[in-house]
A protein has these predicted regions:
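Active-site lining segments that contact anionic ligands and/or coordinate catalytic metals
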Residues: 195
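Extracytoplasmic cell-surface/polysaccharide-interacting catalytic and binding patches
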Residues: 1-58, 62-84, 88-192, 203-217
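Conserved metal-phosphate-binding beta-hairpin within the catalytic cores
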Residues: 198
Length: 217
């Protein structure tokens, strides 16, 4: 999996909470062995098309999901949060299935990811000092993710982020279908409300809560 790109968003401040989540001591993608082997096969297939996977989230400590619950109980809202969620209260995000109190990620069997065009040049970088448009805006206006335009940003709580959304362009639909097809060929199942979320049936089990730490050399 060494060639797979990573941008583990909950290990930093570029996420809907605006800070690192509990348990993310390092920006590392941790997965179960069978998940990793499947990802390796997908990456090899995509490389022949000059594409790469980019991971946004992998294993998520259970304490991080609890951190999200505590965040939702705080009624205050920031401009950064509004980039991800224009329409719903924080509490509604759980009821509508955009955030889970108990996440598949904590079993090591779920992933959030996207596609990167390896031939693309001069990809914009996220600037924490800049005011970006919300996650449904055109790609030139919303926060950059260094990846192919999938129609919304990652973690966007909006119907436009639903994998089969009708409001996206043909090109955006093509790339979503490319990602789903590549993942499906190795047994992954997409979550219909989030184009970026996939899980591997049979790889789940008990939830874990060990913190994510930097790899030792």
């Amino acid at each position: 999996m060494n060639s797979i790109l990573q941008d583990i968003r909950y290990a930093g401040a570029n996420n809907f909470i605006g800070r690192p989540l509990a348990g993310y001591g390092a920006a590392e993608c941790v997965v179960k062995r069978e998940v990793g082997l499947a990802l390796k096969a997908i990456q090899q297939e995509l490389a022949r098309q000059k594409l790469s996977l980019k991971m946004f989230d992998c294993y998520r400590p259970a304490r991080a999901s609890h951190d999200m619950v505590l965040w939702a109980q705080n009624g205050r809202e920031t401009a950064a949060e509004r980039r991800y969620n224009r329409a719903f209260s924080k509490q509604e995000l759980f009821r509508l299935g955009y955030i889970a109190e108990h996440s598949q990620h904590s079993t090591g069997a779920a992933l959030d990811l996207t596609l990167v065009d390896l031939a693309a040049d001069n990809l914009a970088r996220f600037d924490p000092a800049r005011a970006y448009a919300d996650c449904t805006a055109p790609v030139q206006a919303r926060a950059p993710e260094g990846s192919i335009d999938m129609g919304t940003g990652y973690d966007c709580s909006d119907a436009k982020a639903h994998t089969a959304a009708s409001s996206i362009t043909p090109a955006q639909r093509k790339w979503r279908n490319t990602l789903v097809a590549a993942m499906s060929r190795q047994g992954f199942v997409n979550y219909s409300k989030e184009w970026w979320h996939f899980s591997l049936p049979g790889a789940g089990g008990a939830a874990y809560d060990f913190p994510i730490m930097a790899r030792r050399n």
